[in-house]
From Swiss-Prot:
Gene3D superfamilies named in the record: Cell division control protein 42 homolog
Encoding gene, per UniProt annotation: sopB
Written domain comment of the UniProt record: Contains the consensus sequence Cys-X(5)-Arg characteristic of Mg-independent phosphatases.
InterPro entries in alphabetical order: IpgD/SopB
Protein name in UniProt: Inositol phosphate phosphatase SopB
Enzyme class: hydrolase
Active site: 460
Family: Belongs to the phosphatase IpgD/SopB family.
């Protein structure tokens, strides 16, 4: 839809919408319209200009020193600038209204970052809504649409433009390091666009350096927010991988209304997860490319709340489980297209075996009990695959774990301990409560999968918040185990040393960068303060530092989908 120039034909309502938006933006920046007066420098303002993405710079290094404020003004500027860019995509790059706003923002830039005021935070949160209202008012005036229809058009147009902007930005490998007790650990998040054997990514529908953000909820061709997550330690002059797994958004393209297309899309996403899992096993991938039909074991851990009372995640879980079931019938072999080192598509044959779990980890599941019964109906079957039919804690493990232990591997004790912990959790329904550790079952399932040479994969709805916290919990426990050679007891809070590890992981795992990649702002929505307090999960106790907790929360509360 072509929208003509605003100034010569604007209706009164359109003018009012613009003035409201202008007031919100300008007041949020604490400048006077037309004067470009910069905000006064706060007493605790840091003197340097903050520049992220410079060589060696990470969100962790930056946020770790943000002791004086919940939100950085620079972060709010960046978020608002991105939203104006999206609006300009809808209204036109030369739109005089948005150009005026952008110019005012340039004038309002400060030379040093400082804590944002509550007024600035409110303005940043309201800007998206106000931009949509401006687009709606202009659309209504130009096309004579009813107000509701114009607003619906504006919301869809803005969302589509925002998704396109997020998808088309470069999706690149994120690599951060942390040091604890003299050991150097590297956290690597490798996006689908950089899962390459040669010059191109391995997927038949190439990513070409781009990605699929968590808000692209109708995409039936690609998995959302697909990454390979690795943590390694440098010792004896070389890097040793402690853990490698695949993370992603839910397999359901849940805003696709056609049930056949939605299921086809879920299966396409599942195939991409399998391709990524194969990529994470270079030796197995080479055998497949040489023509061998290879077996691939994958432990999928969904983190959704399997209920439709809030958010329809129950239906999403059903879509995901149906996709796994369709691809993993007993004895079934599937053919995947993989782009080889020469850039040519090659068919590989795999026999996938997927143990598909779903473990609710949010307040709805762990505080109110939503979705637990539905999830456990899937979990019982998956546990039998993983641990055999006898799930008594004292019983010898069967299933995949029993097969692994029969080889008397070097990690026999670790595998046996993790298996026993999982069976204890299951027997006592500890995964139904926070109990000081919301991810107690999910995290141990992923760790056990890695230890028995299966591929761990995990996801929530978006692949960034609960998925990111799972990623951090796994890495916290792995680094702690590497240092102490002891696994934490289920439901235990980290001690002071464990909290220090967790704090470093939360800020340097790459998860803040992934959240920014998907939404335009870094911050994890898992971190929240609810009322009454009894509804809150145990993350303030687990993190042990209010400033770190706020840094991990970031500007997530200001971002709306």
């Amino acid at each position: 839809m072509q929208i003509q120039s605003f100034y010569h034909s604007a209706s009164l309502k359109t003018q009012e919408a613009f003035k409201s938006l202008q007031k919100t933006l300008y007041n949020g920046m604490q400048i006077l319209s037309g004067q470009g007066k910069a905000p006064a420098k706060a007493p605790d303002a840091r003197p340097e200009i903050i520049v992220l993405r410079e060589p060696g710079a990470t969100w962790g290094n930056y946020l770790q020193h943000q002791k004086t404020s919940n939100h950085s003004l620079h972060n709010l500027y960046n978020l608002q600038r991105d939203l104006l860019t999206v609006a300009a995509t809808v209204l036109g790059k030369q739109d005089p209204v948005l150009t005026s706003m952008a110019n005012q923002m340039e004038l309002a830039k400060v030379k040093a970052d400082r804590p944002a005021t509550k007024q600035e935070e409110a303005a940043a949160k309201a800007l998206k809504k106000n931009l949509i209202e401006l687009i709606a008012a202009r659309t209504q005036q130009q096309n004579g649409l009813p107000a509701k229809e114009a607003h619906r058009f504006a919301a869809v147009a803005f969302r589509d433009a925002q998704v396109k902007q997020l998808n088309n930005q470069p999706w690149q490998t994120i690599k951060n390091t942390l040091t604890h007790n003299g050991h150097h650990y590297t956290n690597t998040q490798l996006p689908a666009a950089e899962m390459k054997i040669g010059a191109k990514d391995i997927f038949p529908s190439a990513y070409e350096g781009k990605g699929v953000c968590s808000w692209d909820t109708k995409n039936i061709h690609h998995a959302n927010n697909l990454w390979m997550s690795t943590v390694s330690v440098h010792e004896d002059g070389k890097d040793k991988t402690l853990f490698c797994g695949i993370r992603h958004g839910v397999l359901s393209p849940y805003h696709e209304k056609d049930p056949l297309l939605r299921q086809a899309g879920a299966e396409n996403k599942a195939k991409e997860v399998l391709a990524a899992a194969l990529f994470s096993k270079p030796e197995l991938l080479n055998r497949a490319l040489e023509g061998e039909a290879v077996s691939l074991k994958l432990v999928s851990v969904g983190l959704l709340t399997a209920s439709n009372i809030f958010g329809k995640e129950g239906t999403m879980v059903e879509d995901q489980m149906r996709a796994w079931q369709s691809l993993t019938q007993p004895g079934k072999m599937i053919h995947l297209k993989i782009r080889n080192k020469d850039g040519d598509l090659q068919t590989v044959k795999i026999k996938p075996d997927v143990a598909a779990f779903n473990v609710g980890v949010n307040e709805l599941a762990l505080k109110l009990g939503f979705g637990l019964k539905a999830s456990d109906s899937y979990n019982a079957e998956a546990l039998h695959q993983l641990l055999g039919n006898d799930l008594r804690p004292e019983a010898r493990p069967g299933g995949w774990v029993g097969e692994w232990l029969a080889q008397y591997p070097d990690n026999y004790e670790v595998v046996n301990t993790l298996a026993r912990q999982i069976k204890d959790i299951w027997k006592n329904n500890q995964h139904h409560k926070d109990g000081g550790e919301p991810y107690k079952l999910a995290q141990r399932l992923a760790m056990l999968a890695h230890e028995i040479d299966a591929v761990p994969a995990w996801n929530c709805k978006s692949g960034k918040d609960r998925t990111g916290m799972m990623d951090s919990e796994i890495k916290r426990e792995l680094i702690s185990f590497h240092q102490t050679h002891m696994l934490s007891a289920p439901g235990s809070l980290p001690d002071s040393g464990g909290q220090k590890i967790f704090q470093k992981v939360l800020l340097n795992s790459g998860n803040l960068e992934i959240q920014k990649q998907n939404t335009g702002g870094a911050g994890n929505k898992v971190m929240k303060n609810l009322s009454p307090e009894v509804l809150n999960l145990s993350y303030q106790k687990r993190v042990g530092d209010e400033n770190i907790w706020q840094s991990v929360k970031g500007i997530s509360s200001l971002i709306t989908s």
